[in-house]
Amino acid sequence: MNAYRLYLVTDDQQDLPTLKHVVRKAVEGGVTMVQVREKHGDVREFIERAQAVKTILEGTGVPLIINDRVDVALAVDADGVHLGQSDMPAEIARQLIGPNKILGLSIETEDQLAEADSLPIDYIGLSAIFATPTKTNTKKHWGIGGLKMALNTTSLPIVAIGGINETNIPALSATGVHGLALVSAICHAENPTKAAEYLLSLMD
């Protein structure tokens, strides 16, 4: 199974009951990976939210990824970590989490892309494909053309992130990209189960 296919990134603006509801329903709809992202809260709150999501995911086969914080990933024994370019270097993160955890890295420029294959990572998050309200400090927008170029450049699986929604999923899927990461299209949906099912149907 391709675990990257429909990659849910949680919304750190949602309270804990909403977060749990979204994750539970999204997994019922076919989400294949969940990344808990916390940019504003304290570490204790991050651990609490990550632990709550881990409990929901137990027995589902859906991996739990922690955004940025290796310490939080270790604290809850998550399945992996996703690093940004300003986070801990990938080599150090790999030493800390060991050889069997999933390690992802955000790639924002062509120079970073060129180096990716030499790093001890499992996948890259290509950011941002399109403009997005959830991330305003992006270095560039790759677009479909940039995504195709990236797929030809690296041997690593690519998860596309940034501005992905029902209107552009068919074109993105046609590139052969390994996965699509979404926040708003699932977290803000009235029914996250139906949203996930619908988004998956657009990938076929």
Curated annotation (Swiss-Prot):
Pathway in which the depicted protein is active: Cofactor biosynthesis; thiamine diphosphate biosynthesis; thiamine phosphate from 4-amino-2-methyl-5-diphosphomethylpyrimidine and 4-methyl-5-(2-phosphoethyl)-thiazole: step 1/1
Annotated residues for binding of Mg(2+): 68, 87
Write one Gene Ontology MF term.
Answer: magnesium ion binding
Q: What does the note under cofactor report? A: Binds 1 Mg(2+) ion per subunit.
Pfam families per UniProt: TMP-TENI
Cofactors named for this entry: Mg(2+)
UniProt keywords, alphabetically: Magnesium, Metal-binding, Thiamine biosynthesis, Transferase
InterPro entries per the UniProt record, alphabetical: Aldolase_TIM, ThiamineP_synth_sf, ThiamineP_synth_TenI, TMP_synthase
Catalysed reaction per UniProt? 2-[(2R,5Z)-2-carboxy-4-methylthiazol-5(2H)-ylidene]ethyl phosphate + 4-amino-2-methyl-5-(diphosphooxymethyl)pyrimidine + 2 H(+) = thiamine phosphate + CO2 + diphosphate; 2-(2-carboxy-4-methylthiazol-5-yl)ethyl phosphate + 4-amino-2-methyl-5-(diphosphooxymethyl)pyrimidine + 2 H(+) = thiamine phosphate + CO2 + diphosphate; 4-methyl-5-(2-phosphooxyethyl)-thiazole + 4-amino-2-methyl-5-(diphosphooxymethyl)pyrimidine + H(+) = thiamine phosphate + diphosphate
Give the residues the record marks as binding 2-[(2R,5Z)-2-carboxy-4-methylthiazol-5(2H)-ylidene]ethyl phosphate.
132-134, 163, 183-184
| Top-level lineage group | Bacteria
Enzyme Commission identifier(s): 2.5.1.3
- Name any Gene Ontology BP term: thiamine biosynthetic process
Which pairs are disulfide-linked? none
One annotated Gene Ontology cellular component of this protein:
cytoplasm
Query: What are the binding positions for 4-amino-2-methyl-5-(diphosphooxymethyl)pyrimidine in this chain?
Result: 35-39, 67, 106, 135
| Statement: the UniProt record of this protein carries the keyword Oxidoreductase | no
Provide the family line. Belongs to the thiamine-phosphate synthase family.
Describe the task this protein carries out.
Answer: Condenses 4-methyl-5-(beta-hydroxyethyl)thiazole monophosphate (THZ-P) and 2-methyl-4-amino-5-hydroxymethyl pyrimidine pyrophosphate (HMP-PP) to form thiamine monophosphate (TMP).
In its UniProt entry, what is this protein called? Thiamine-phosphate synthase
Originating organism: Vibrio parahaemolyticus serotype O3:K6 (strain RIMD 2210633)
